[in-house]
Structures are given as structure tokens and as C-alpha cells.
Amino acid sequence: MKGSLDITASDFFCGAGGSTTGMISIPGVRVSAASNHWDKAIETHQYNHQHTEHILADLSQITPKLFPRTTIGWFSPECTWHSNARGAKRLAAQISLLSDDLPSEAAERSRATMWDVVRFTEYHRYELVFVENVVEIYSWPLYRPWIAAMHALGYEHRLICLNSMHSWTFGTPAPQSRDRVYVCFWKAGNRAPDFET
């Protein structure tokens, strides 16, 4: 970033475009690419953000080199199997050797999306990486190894808990109350972002 006025971002697991809308509300930021595995999400995002390149894909099934290099990687990995809102007991990320019960494929895939963050960051070496998820992600058994993997790539991090309904720095706050965790990574040696302003 170092003084550049052209800050680019990629929005992964983009949904309808709320994160993109937030990013482009910051002067100098543009979202170059957005991706999701669901065609309806891509259709909606494309309608809302026509100047962004859209890629319909399951990130685990494609190579990161298909995406443009950007300053920021924004990831909103699937949170269904981390969240208590699901209404079912969360499944452990590790399979017990003493149990015949195996986690469902959907649960494993949901948690595996967190590792797409590491894989894409390793390839693109973003200046900043933001990961938005539910607060329960902190109790995921592989949370610490996941953080350690990002540290091994040369990033420092800070964990921020925020209900977006109470955040209105750049405009109207979100119209719903949902607690979220934002794990913010920056390259070690670079100045840490100012999270207080």
C-alpha cells in the first residue's frame, strides 16, 4: 500500500455484495474481483457491482492464479458449521478414533473454507487480509493452527469483535444485529492498521 491511492481488493465468498459495498465506500478502494460458488450470489453481486470481475467457483476447486493480484484479500468463509445459530450441536473438527460417527461432508467442507484463506494468501501475498466470520470461530479446534499457518506466511494479526449494526463510520450501519469476528492480518514489518479510528 505504501502511499498508493489505488487500493484493490478481492472479495471471496462474496454473497450479494455487502462487504464490497463497505470496501468501496472507503476513498481509493476498488474491488477488482468477487467470487462465490452459488450462481444466485454472483448474479446479485454482479447487479450491485457491475465494475467488478465476477468468478463463479468453489475456491477449493480452482487455482488462486485465476484471480488478479490485489492489495487486500477479503474472505467471508462459510460459517454454518461454526455457528450456534444453526440450532444443532457443533461437530468437532477432528474425527475421534474411538467413534464410528463421522462428520457430514457439508460440515467438513464448511470448515475447510477457512483453509482457502491460507492457500490464496500464500499465492497472492496480500498486503492486508480480512476474514469475517461468526464469533464461534474462536472455539473451532483448528483456529490456533489456522492462525499459526498465517503467521508462518509472515503475517501478524488482530482479532476484532464487532456488531456491524453499531458501526457507521462511512454511512448507514447494517440493518441487522449480528455479532461478528474480523481477523485482520498484515505483513510482518509493515505498520499495523489503525483499528481505533
What is each PLM-predicted segment?
Residues F12, H37, L59, N133-V134:
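Generic detector of well-ordered alpha-helical packing
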Residues R30-A33, E53, E156-R158:
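Conserved beta-strand segments of alpha/beta enzyme cores
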Residues I62-I72, H82-T197:
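Class I S-adenosyl-L-methionine
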Residues P77-E78:
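Short glycine-/small-residue-rich Rossmann-like dinucleotide-binding loops
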